[in-house]
Amino acid sequence: MTTTQLNSPQMSDTSLSSAEEKQGSLSAIKLQLEAQLHAQLQAQLQAQLQEWLGPKGVTFSGETFIVPETHDMVKTLFDPTLHKSNFELIILACLFANLVVFAIPLNQVRTLVFIGLYVFWRLSYNFGIGYLLQQQSLHNRLVDWAKEGKLFDEKNKLFWAQFVQHEVKSQRGKDYAINSLPIEFNTWLVFRKFVDLILMSDFITFCCVVYTCAVENASDFTNHWLVWSRVLTGIGLILFNLWVKVNAHNTIKDYAWYWGDFFFRQINNEELIFDGVFEMVPHPMYSVGYVGYYGFALIAKSYTVLAIAIFGHFLQMIFLHYIENPHIDKIYGPSKNEINLIKILKLKDLKSFDNMPPLVGLYNFNWMRSSDLLNLLLVATYAVILPLFSQSTTQYFALTVTTKLIESFGISTLLVLQSYSKYFTKWCLSNDIPVEKSLNNWAVMYNTLINLTYSSLFGLNLMYFLRGSADLLYHDLLYLRIFIGTLLIFTQTWINASIIDLIGYFGWFYGDFFIPKSQSFANHLTKAGVYRYLNNPEQIFGVCGVMGVFIIWPTFENLTCCVLWVLSNFIRINFIEKWHMIRLYGEQEVNQDSGVTKTFKKHLIPEVIQRKISGDEPLRRRPSSPSLADSLDTFIKELTNSKTKLSQQKLVELSQNLSFANSNYKLTIEGLKYNDLKTAKFATLGSPLKVIWQSPLATHSSKDWIGLYRIINTTYSRNRTILSSAGRWTYCPDANGSYVFARNKLFWEEGVYEFRYHLDGKHDVAYISEPFELKHESVSVPLHDDEVEVFALALKEKIFDRLLDIESTTVPIAQVATSQTDNVLATYQLLSSVISTSTKVQISSKIFLKSDQITILDVARKLYDINKVLDELSYDLSIKKDE
């Protein structure tokens, strides 16, 4: 190359242009990095500022504010360093006034007085606090009363207004400006004192009842091992109760402790908290939060205290059911789309049971079902008739044990054979029984054997009770035994009902053993409800009712039955069901730590040992790191909550915790229909679906896209889609627009589906449409030859036109299929599948391969011929034949 060529103007311009491009690229990268760093610093500053100022609250009228720090009940009342308000002084006076009762000389009278006081305060809890909270939840009544009475208006000089304002200022300090915070917060402050009065008085009067009853039974406190075991057990229950209360308060703080979400919402408390003791048991404040009461009863050795504890605990559960739970469902419950999805899945759950709820025990009994009548006769025979007429209790005990052994060995053996070799399914198919029917047949057999075992156990105890010939292993504490035994029986019933509600009849009857995973409705094990706290709740609580029977009637026979039930249940769950679930869902999902295990590790195992244990686990057992979906979810929430005022509609949606409810994105589907019950929407297979999208113009990207997905494959995340759309997607070039999904853009399988709006060519989800079901179009096969052409037109319109552009019913299908599709065999298989399901006449894809000249009219005539043969082979049992 010459010097002239090296120094040519063209080469110089090219080099200069290249350098400028590199410089521009570096500048763009620098600006991008600076923007990212600025955003990160801003987010950190906002987080630190929010932590310093306190949590952010929003009233139900849309006003936002910083929630000030408050103190718990015990610290407020009994910490001498804190200033006491007027209400707090009144509360302390009421508590110390209980000492006046001890001036009564007779201890029995003191006990009656304290019982009366406890009943008064306990009823005040239910009908005082409960009534006020219900009115506040439904009608915002307390806040309205405060507004109507102008209680927080500094211009109001009425006594009650001045008294309430002085009370609030005495709580928050003299410099507290009442109008600086919403009236909802001030009303909550006053309501807290009413709660403090009732709760503290309730507990103090109960302690006084315990003391007076313990004094009455002072002679029972002798130096004996049984006394010490009773006292130590009671102290253990009380200490556990104390830990539950402290842990619960540390987890949910004053906001939830004093029902703050009845008055306003905290931005960072938009979902229920499952941490600490809340991860260990459901509703710990109402369930295990009262075990200390039974500990007091043990220490006092008083049935009076036990009855009072049961009375208080029962009223607390009533409060939970009628006051707390409805508000929880209102604020934190599922969205409308989720409710519709649950309804659809529950209806789908009955598909394997002839679309009727199957018999569980004697629940769902149907007089028109022969298997139900048979179960009723067997239960009556084993539970009542045989015990009344049997002459030998020993023989009936042998019958009970034999029945349980047959049930245990038979059910377990069939489950093992089904798990490893699909024995039961193969038998059903060999006898021309569809796979869907196999689960129903199994359910009838399984439930019948279970009914036989429990009815025989009931009959055995009925026989001993009527004859009074049983030798009890323990005779004392009859009423305590009855209470504990009844509680265990009730617990087993409740646990079983909860399990069925969560996993459906499909899961209750081991549907995973009989129905292929691809046809089931969930690809993941549930971790909701009772399964949030225990991986296998039925392992203990599934047989605790039998333990309760033994406690009530402690005989050798009941002890033997109890051991049999526990061993059978343990073996079936741990050595059959668990291993099948591992093969089906994977070891990582099956062996996840339950809530109880997590709490146990957190509080009882040192952190060093925990790190050692987690370090020894295989990589596949370690939890995955947080995904970017959480960042997107937080981003959308921050956009919504950044305003100082929220619209009424957005506020309602926020209070109901609707997924994507506050998003500026929206998807609307045209072409859906309501089912007969008006409970869910559906479309027929192949019907075009028009999707209309709306997105904010400022943030819209031409790479935004919409995809169609099966819900059972995307339930793992509502904020990010990892599953491929398999071509069922389209770009959204404009901020607002529509697109018609048809043919290969649709799924051709029945199921529940949804559309997802994704951002900027990525898989971050901005909006999810309402769930809808795809169903097969029903096409009736004619009974007469002259209706075949009409039938062919129906096939063309409802099936063929949705896959191929065929001009008429006499055009060869192969001619069109080969020119319009890339995979002819797949098209033929899809056509045969849809036709078979829609007409309920099974045909094979080979029908299209036998001749290249076959037309839609030929297919219609073939279906007519098959149906005619099947109709001739069948007959109507309701029509009597001529003899």
From Swiss-Prot:
Residues 1-85, 133-193, 245-279, 324-372, 418-441, 491-539 are lumenal. Pfam families: PEMT (PF04191). GO terms for biological process: methylation; phosphatidylcholine biosynthetic process. It is found in: Endoplasmic reticulum membrane. Keywords: Endoplasmic reticulum, Lipid biosynthesis, Lipid metabolism, Membrane, Methyltransferase, Phospholipid biosynthesis, Phospholipid metabolism, S-adenosyl-L-methionine, Transferase, Transmembrane, Transmembrane helix. It comes from the Eukaryota. It catalyses: a 1,2-diacyl-sn-glycero-3-phosphoethanolamine + S-adenosyl-L-methionine = a 1,2-diacyl-sn-glycero-3-phospho-N-methylethanolamine + S-adenosyl-L-homocysteine + H(+). GO terms for cellular component: endoplasmic reticulum membrane. Gene3D superfamilies: 1.20.120.1630. PROSITE patterns: S5A_REDUCTASE, SAM_CHO2. Residues 107-111, 215-223, 301-302, 394-396, 463-469, 561-883 are cytoplasmic. Its EC number is 2.1.1.17. Pathway: Phospholipid metabolism; phosphatidylcholine biosynthesis. Signal peptide: none annotated. The chain crosses the membrane at residues 86-106, 112-132, 194-214, 224-244, 280-300, 303-323, 373-393, 397-417, 442-462, 470-490, 540-560. GO terms for molecular function: phosphatidylethanolamine N-methyltransferase activity. It is a multi-pass membrane protein. Catalyzes the first step of the methylation pathway of phosphatidylcholine biosynthesis, the SAM-dependent methylation of phosphatidylethanolamine (PE) to phosphatidylmonomethylethanolamine (PMME). PANTHER family: PHOSPHATIDYLETHANOLAMINE N-METHYLTRANSFERASE. This is Phosphatidylethanolamine N-methyltransferase.
